[in-house]
C-alpha cells in the first residue's frame, strides 16, 4: 500500500472530527434559558465590548438576557448579583469585579445557579474566560525593551496590580522580562492612575514627572494594566515637546489608542490588543456548552494580538473590526 493511501483514512478521520466539532458548535443552544449578565461598568470600551459579545451571543443562541450595570462601583456590581439571584436566572456571566463579588458568587452557587466569570478567577466559577494575561505582560515587556535598545529609565503607571489579579499578572510578567535587561531601570516610586477620567489624570501626573526628569533622564512610560491613561501621557509629551525622546507602551489596544499609535512619529510605540467581544461571546458559548453537558476547562484563554508601530496599528484596527485607518 502506498504512503498516500495509508494517510487517506487518517485524513478522512480528521475531517470527520473537524466536521463533528463544527456541528457541535452549531448545535449550541440556550433556548428557554435566562442568563444574567453582570457588568462592573460601561465607561471603558473593553467592558462595553465584552458585555456586547456576551449578550448578543446569548440571544443568538435563543436565550434571554437580564443585564445589570455596576456603574464602575465594585460594591454596586457585587450587589447586582443579588438581583440576578432573586430573578432566579439559569446562569450568570459576571464581567470583572474585585473580591466583593465572592460571597455573591457563593450564594448563587448554593442556590444551584452556575456562575461564569470574565477576567475574574474565582473558586465559585465554573469557567473564567479571559485574555492570555501572561502573554500580554511578557510581550509588552519584550517590545518595550526592544524599543529602548535594552537600556533606559522607565516610569510605570501601576495602580491596580494589588487589587485585580489580571493586572498583577500583566505587571509581574512585564517586570519579569525586564530582569533580562539590567540596564533598564524602573523609576521609583511608581505612579498610580485614577480610573475615573484617567487620560486627564495621567496627563497631569506625566507633566509633573517630566518636570522632575528632564530630557535624557526618562526614556519610556509604561501603563501596566490597560491603556486609557496612555492617551493623557501622549498629550503631555506633545505639550512639552518630549514626544521624540520618551516612548509610551501599554496594554489593551482599544480603538482610541490604536488611532494614536497609527499617527506618523507617534511616541506610542507598542501595545498588545485584547479581543473583548470574542471573550464575552466565548463565555456565553461556554454557558451553552455547560448546559449541553460538555466538560469545560477552569479557564478559557483568548489569544492576544501584539501591536508595534503605525502600520501594525492600522492592520489590527481593521482586524478587530473597528474600521479602517488611512
Task: Name these PLM-found stretches.
Residues 29, 77, 129-155, 199-206, ...:
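Hydrophobic alpha-helical segments within soluble ligand-binding/sensing domains
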Amino acid at each position: 500500500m502506498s504512503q498516500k493511501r495509508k494517510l487517506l483514512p487518517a485524513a478522512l478521520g480528521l475531517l470527520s472530527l473537524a466536521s463533528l466539532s463544527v456541528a457541535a458548535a452549531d448545535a449550541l443552544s440556550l433556548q428557554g434559558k435566562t442568563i444574567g449578565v453582570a457588568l462592573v461598568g460601561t465607561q471603558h470600551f473593553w467592558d462595553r465590548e465584552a458585555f456586547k459579545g456576551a449578550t448578543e451571543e446569548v440571544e443568538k443562541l435563543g436565550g434571554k438576557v437580564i443585564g445589570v450595570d455596576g456603574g464602575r462601583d465594585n460594591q454596586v456590581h457585587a450587589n447586582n448579583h443579588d438581583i440576578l439571584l432573586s430573578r432566579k436566572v439559569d446562569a450568570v456571566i459576571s464581567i470583572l469585579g474585585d473580591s466583593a463579588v465572592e460571597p455573591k458568587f457563593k450564594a448563587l452557587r448554593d442556590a444551584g445557579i452556575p456562575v461564569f466569570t470574565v477576567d475574574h478567577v474565582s473558586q465559585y466559577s465554573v469557567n473564567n474566560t479571559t485574555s492570555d494575561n501572561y502573554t500580554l505582560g511578557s510581550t509588552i515587556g519584550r517590545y518595550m525593551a526592544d524599543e529602548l535598545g535594552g537600556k533606559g529609565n522607565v516610569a510605570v503607571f501601576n495602580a491596580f496590580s494589588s487589587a485585580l489579579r489580571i493586572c498583577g499578572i500583566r505587571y509581574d510578567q512585564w517586570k519579569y522580562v525586564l530582569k533580562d535587561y539590567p540596564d533598564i531601570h524602573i523609576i521609583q516610586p511608581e505612579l498610580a492612575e485614577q480610573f475615573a477620567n484617567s487620560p486627564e489624570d495621567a496627563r497631569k501626573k506625566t507633566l509633573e514627572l517630566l518636570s522632575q526628569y528632564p530630557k535624557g533622564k526618562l526614556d519610556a512610560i509604561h501603563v501596566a494594566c490597560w491603556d486609557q491613561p496612555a492617551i493623557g501621557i501622549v498629550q503631555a509629551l506633545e505639550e512639552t515637546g518630549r514626544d521624540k525622546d520618551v516612548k509610551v507602551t501599554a496594554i489593551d489596544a482599544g480603538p482610541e489608542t490604536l488611532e494614536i499609535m497609527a499617527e506618523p512619529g507617534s511616541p506610542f510605540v507598542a501595545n498588545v490588543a485584547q479581543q473583548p467581544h470574542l471573550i464575552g461571546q466565548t463565555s456565553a458559548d461556554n454557558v451553552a456548552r455547560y448546559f449541553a453537558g460538555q466538560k469545560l476547562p477552569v479557564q478559557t484563554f483568548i489569544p492576544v494580538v501584539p501591536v508595534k508601530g503605525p502600520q501594525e496599528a492600522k492592520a489590527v484596527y481593521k482586524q478587530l473590526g473597528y474600521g479602517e485607518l488611512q
